[in-house]
Amino acid sequence: MLDKLSKHKTMFYERVKEIDQILFSQQQAKQTQLDNLSNNNASGGFFSGFMKMFSPLSTPPNSSSNNNSNTQQAISQETRKLCSVNNNRHEPIYNQYTTNSQVIRSFPAVSSIGQSSTNMYNSVNICDGISSSEKRSPTPPRNRSNSNDKILFGHYDALGSLPQNNMGHYQQPPQQSSQQQQQPLVPKQNSVTALRNTTSATSSTTTANNKKPSLDQIPELKGVDRKLLDHILNEVIETKTTNWDDIAGLKDAKQTLLETVILPSIRPDLFNGLRAPCRGILLFGPPGTGKTMIARACASQCNATFFSISAGSLVSKYHGEGEKLVRCLFAAARYLQPSVIFIDEIDSILSARSSEEHEASRRMKTEFMIQMDGVSNMNGKEDRVLVMGATNIPTELDEAILRRFTKRIYIPLPDHAARASLIKQLSHGQNMSLSETDINKICVATEGFSGSDLTALCKETSMVPLREISMDQLISIDARKIRPIVLKDFQSSLVHVRPSTSQDTIKKLEKWNESYGTFAKGI
């Protein structure tokens, strides 16, 4: 079957080539005759002879006075196809054929580049119907999610938006100027997505001035290494809105954060000069008391960019790269302001300096303190960047760091009312049968528990009704037939779940709070 098809293709190819050669020969002959007639100097000789040869409606030379009107008749359509008045001709059709003996056909086409129509030949493969001029690189998938291509290269969003030709294939849209295709490198809006697109630009991308894209075009990011900036942007957390109601208790801490963080963002005209908001807030207290959630709530209420930094974010194996990461962190925070830089377990990064520590750690701490003071900010404006640190061991922090954290807020263990509120929040939507008296009894029994300890207790209690059911019944039982959780289940779970913070740790933290802590003062 394939041999027959190949044979027919070859025969058809030869036949088309012969026809084209005949047409080309006729064109040459007609052109020669036309040139000979043009040399005739007799009055009306050119048109009368021309119409005699090509037009069936022409009259003999010896006819009446209708010769003048006949000589002004238009050239026939057949003559227009075979010859050209301006002595220009098209190249033979077979010169455009492919060399692999493909079955092809030729037809006059119109240029699709937005210019005037041109009578040009366009070779088309009959087997697959794809024009050779339309062969291009594979079209990207319909659903494109890479915003970097849309911003820096100006690619088209989807294949479905492209027009179709008469063969049912997609056509490339008209080419636009480089100024319309290329978007400016510097983002118009200081968003994390736009900044990530800028850092992911390849070296082959060029701007309107044929220069490689550089972060130096952004004043806040001048001199920042692209790879380090991309590493810092990975620490940005984009979470759902966290409200103050999600945090149980901590009335004094909420009041202090309200006047130092939330109100200055709402009324910046009132908080300037001596009322200017502080640059650093230290949250210290036992583990599991919600220090991270408080920082997220502050960033959410201020609509700020939230950087979650740990020791691994600023420590590098390369010599001298730690301080560069610190500088890059504050540069990105200033560009994306308002920003909140939250450093969990800050004592692991900014501990007290000593002569035995490594030189790289000392330089990194020094750079952090310089950036936190804002010495490198030369624009004269107040940066809306807040540094929040959380630690369980505030005694390990360097004194110079403590000076920069002007607000040091103690986050204690939840009291009786806070534990009751937290238990109600955790039991919301669960099958629990607890009265107010039962909740009070649970709060009394959980004295010294942190928020994470109470969460672990509730999870352990929720498994008690399931353990009473055999494995065979548990596979097929209806969830609505499982009995609710009662006070007895909490009492049995208290045997397995114990508080994680010792009383000695609580006393040390309370003593440090009396010496260095900040107490809330109501407005």
From Swiss-Prot:
Q: Where in the cell is it found?
A: Membrane
> PROSITE patterns given for it?
AAA
Q: How does this polypeptide assemble, per the annotation?
A: Homohexamer. The homohexamer is stabilized by ATP-binding. The homohexamer may adopt a ring conformation through which microtubules pass prior to being severed.
Return the GO cellular component terms, semicolon-separated. Answer: cytoplasm; membrane; microtubule
**PANTHER family per record:** AAA DOMAIN-CONTAINING, SPASTIN
Disordered: annotated span: 57-77, 129-218
| EC numbers, comma separated | 5.6.1.1
Protein name per UniProt = Spastin
Give residue ranges on the Cytoplasmic side.
1-41, 59-523
* Intramembrane-annotated stretches: 42-58
Q: Which UniProt keywords apply?
A: Allosteric enzyme, ATP-binding, Isomerase, Membrane, Microtubule, Nucleotide-binding
Name the protein family. Answer: Belongs to the AAA ATPase family. Spastin subfamily.
Source domain of life = Eukaryota
* SMART domains for this protein: AAA
Q: Which Pfam families match?
A: AAA, AAA_lid_3, Vps4_C
Tell me the Gene Ontology biological-process terms attached to this UniProt entry. microtubule cytoskeleton organization
A GO molecular function annotation here is: ATP binding
Q: Which reaction does it catalyse?
A: n ATP + n H2O + a microtubule = n ADP + n phosphate + (n+1) alpha/beta tubulin heterodimers
Matching entries from InterPro entries are given as: AAA+_ATPase, AAA_lid_3, ATPase_AAA_core, ATPase_AAA_CS, MT-severing_AAA_ATPase, P-loop_NTPase, Spast_Vps4_C
Give me the stretches of Low complexity compositional bias: 57-71, 171-184, 193-210
Its biological purpose is as follows: ATP-dependent microtubule severing protein. Stimulates microtubule minus-end depolymerization and poleward microtubule flux in the mitotic spindle.
Membrane topology label: Peripheral membrane protein
